[in-house]
Curated annotation (Swiss-Prot):
Reaction it catalyzes: an alpha-L-fucosyl-(1->2)-beta-D-galactosyl derivative + UDP-alpha-D-galactose = an alpha-D-galactosyl-(1->3)-[alpha-L-fucosyl-(1->2)]-beta-D-galactosyl derivative + UDP + H(+)
Observed phenotype of the null mutant: Cells show an accumulation of the non-galactosylated isoform of Skp1 in cells.
Secreted recorded as keyword: no
Family matches, as InterPro entries: G-protein_beta_WD-40_rep (IPR020472), Nucl-diP-sugar_transferase (IPR005069), WD-F-box_domain-protein (IPR050995), WD40/YVTN_repeat-like_dom_sf (IPR015943), WD40_repeat_CS (IPR019775), WD40_repeat_dom_sf (IPR036322), WD40_rpt (IPR001680)
Biological processes, Gene Ontology terms: culmination involved in sorocarp development; post-translational protein modification; protein glycosylation; SCF complex assembly
Function: Specifically catalyzes the transfer of a galactosyl residue to the hydroxyproline-linked saccharide on Skp1 protein (fpaA/fpaB). Catalyzes the formation of a Gal-alpha-1,3-Fuc linkage, leading to Gal-Fuc-Gal-GlcNAc-HyPro143-Skp1.
Annotated protein name in UniProt: UDP-galactose:fucoside alpha-3-galactosyltransferase
Activity regulation text: Stimulated by dithiothreitol (DTT) in vitro. Totally inhibited by EDTA.
GO MF entries: fucosylgalactoside 3-alpha-galactosyltransferase activity
The enzyme's E.C. designation: 2.4.1.37
SMART domains linked to this entry: WD40 (SM00320)
Effect of pH on activity: Optimum pH is 6.4-7.4.
Family statement: Belongs to the glycosyltransferase 77 family.
Length: 648
């Protein structure tokens, strides 16, 4: 065993970064750290997307940081003198969570985020050992930096060298280097960042500025001969030995390390294109230390999780809105419609990258428009198109309601056909009676209103709630409207007359946040401020009372419910919470009456069980969810300004 004390320094940090597609390479490198007894406190792992962060932080229990370009730019350590007048290239949306290949624009975009992280850590006073993740470590490189090089060259001070950098085939390699924190190196990285663009990556920039700002310290004599100006301004760099720090060409092709029977410090699996090729080459040379099940989400679930149920990882992240997501809908042809407090509606189209399903592809914005200029959009309804050949956007008409207290009716080019007014408060939801021209809205003004698309003069107002009306649902067969409110009640209304038929107290923490109607079983489902779900039979409205619910679901979430969706094909209730949780519950028939948490005063015939736990909106309220049968996906939108998709 080699000594560790001399080369482990508190202000040295190993820094690495990965996206979800390279999680296996990163795990392979971390396995090397484990073999070398490199303590977790010595390295910082940055995750470039939510999926990678969730994988490492939650499923693997590995401490990591979610990379945020905005956070780094706005941090006190990185903001000064960082960007030129035109700013650096914003790489958001250019790279994805998938494995990128050399030469692709996504690959260069990822490369150009790397120096931002390095600069941020340098400015915090740490020396940085940057390592790409397509590298394996056979020995701790710090032994070479602090012991071997110093002894061979009689360097007396650890900081005699500013930069130790790996050699590539023709110049330096930006995939592995150790750089000390000082004014010279900070300026070097800053200048490199300011030179980046979509065609120039970090390696090209670093090579360029090292030629003008650096001196190659090949021996102590060169170090001693430096002028005072050079000592002050020039980066003193050292090229790492090609045999001890081989790149892909030198190790796998020329085999210069193996020819001398040397154990290298690292092996860089570059100079080969494609993630699959890198992995195959590692396997061929016995340098792959993990199993495929270690990167499989389902095999990494914590068995101590609630009821040992499956934890679902989201498939796609849709980022384009600049504020809270308020509603999600989809058309029959698979277009996705999202709205936000940012006053815009966005239409998304799924594009396959390979294969024929949503396992391979991304969502791209097909159209975006700001449509309620005086308030955020809160609810939408899509009238799907019957003739897709004449409509690029997958809908015939669109209804939107807003914080500006209006409802807008749009054509398929997002031009306003009609504006409906009447509410004096924020409109929380709108629903449409199927195969009719009538629609209903509920508002913070404590009322529900009925409108007619074909008759602007038709209006009916449902008055009775003593607080804002948060949600409504329709039973078309019984001509009944249901509503819930922060006054703690659920009301049943006759659609034809506007008369209130019944009032029940939900006893769900005061504010009843959401109700949905189950057509198949003639049941009403309510979600409360206390995190419970109740199911009510609508068979006998006149004899309804507060305790006559069929089933009470204790979600085990100390958080209020924001949205509910019911999938009649699978009998699953999807439930979104204020604390960022998302769960599904399975409803099953039970004629023996030993359901969980049922009201024993009723002849209960249903039972429930936790089906899945969906994790993705970390510490951010989920505002809305949507089941898309055309895409076979569940979507969620949150206060984090993101939409995420999940397999149904």
């Amino acid at each position: 065993m080699e000594k560790k004390v001399e080369y482990i320094k508190e202000n040295d940090k190993i820094v690495l970064m990965c996206n979800y597609g390279f999680r296996d390479m990163t795990l392979n490198l971390l396995k090397c750290f484990e073999k070398l007894s490199i303590d977790k406190s010595r390295y910082i792992l940055y995750c470039m997307d939510d999926k990678a962060y969730q994988f490492f932080a939650e499923f693997k229990g590995i401490e990591c940081q979610r990379f945020s370009r905005d956070d780094i730019i706005n941090s006190s350590t990185s903001s000064t003198q960082l960007f030129h007048d035109n700013n650096t290239n914003d790489n958001k949306g250019i790279y994805s969570e998938n494995a990128e290949s050399y030469g692709d624009i996504g690959f260069r975009a990822i490369c150009n985020e790397k120096p931002l992280v390095v600069l941020d850590v340098l400015k915090k006073g740490y020396n940085v050992l940057w390592t790409d993740t397509d590298i394996v470590w056979k020995r701790d490189p710090f032994i070479h930096f602090y012991q071997d090089i110093n002894q061979e060259n009689q360097f007396t001070n650890d900081d005699d060298i500013d930069l130790y950098v790996q050699q590539d085939d023709d110049d330096i390699c930006a995939g592995f280097y150790f750089i000390r924190s000082n004014q010279r190196t900070i300026k070097f990285i800053q200048d490199s960042i300011n030179f980046l663009n979509p065609c120039i990556d970090d390696q090209i920039a670093m090579r360029l500025f090292l030629k003008s700002q650096g001196i190659n310290i090949k021996s102590k004599n060169i170090l001693l001969s430096l002028s005072e100006n050079d000592k002050k301004d020039k980066i003193r760099y050292r090229l790492l030995d090609k045999k001890l720090f081989p790149n892909g060409t030198n190790y796998f092709n020329l085999k210069i390390t193996q020819r001398d029977n040397i154990t290298p410090f690292i092996i860089h699996n570059n100079c080969i294109i494609g993630h699959r090729s890198k992995k195959d080459r590692f396997i061929e040379y016995g340098l792959w230390y993990i199993n495929d099940d270690e990167i499989d989400i389902n095999s990494n679930i914590n068995n101590d999780d609630e009821n040992n149920k499956e934890i679902k990882l989201f498939k796609n992240v849709l980022k384009n809105h600049t504020d809270i997501i308020t509603s999600i809908n989809s058309s029959d042809d698979g277009k996705l419609f999202t709205t936000s407090i940012d006053k815009s509606i966005k239409i998304w189209k799924f594009e396959n990258t390979s294969g024929n399903d949503t396992d391979n592809g991304i969502f791209k914005v097909l159209k975006s428009k700001y449509i309620h200029k005086r308030g955020g959009i809160w609810s939408t309804f899509i009238f799907s198109s019957n003739n897709n050949n004449n409509n690029d956007y997958g809908f015939e008409n669109l209804l939107t309601s807003s914080h500006d207290k209006t409802i807008q009716y749009w054509d398929n080019n997002l031009q306003v056909i009609q504006t409906f007014i009447g509410h004096t408060g924020i409109i929380n939801q709108l629903i449409v009676i199927p195969n009719s021209s009538y629609f209903f809205t509920c508002s913070d003004d404590n009322t529900i209103r009925q409108f007619d698309l074909n008759n602007i003069n038709f209006k009916r107002v449902f008055i009775g709630h003593n607080g804002w009306v948060s949600s409504i649902a329709i039973n078309k067969n019984l001509n009944t409207l249901y509503s819930c409110s922060n006054d703690g009640t659920i009301r049943f209304w006759d659609i034809n007359s506007g008369r209130c038929l019944n009032i029940i107290k939900g006893n769900q923490g005061g504010w009843i946040r959401k109700i949905i109607y189950n057509d198949n079983l003639n049941q009403l489902i309510s979600g409360g401020n206390d995190g419970t779900i109740k199911i009510w039979s609508c068979d006998n409205l006149n004899n309804f009372n507060d305790n006559q619910y069929l089933l009470k679901i204790n979600t085990n979430e100390n958080s209020s419910i924001n949205d509910l969706q019911f999938d009649s094909d699978t009998n699953l209730i999807y439930c979104a919470f204020e604390n960022g949780s998302l769960k599904s519950f399975k409803l099953t028939s039970n004629n023996n009456n030993n359901n969980n948490n049922n009201n024993n005063n009723n002849n209960n015939t249903i039972n429930y069980s936790l089906d899945k736990v969906y994790q993705g909106h970390l510490n951010s309220s989920i505002n809305c969810i949507h089941i898309s049968k055309s895409l076979n996906l569940l979507f969620s939108g949150g206060f984090d300004k993101q939409i995420k998709s999940w397999d149904l």
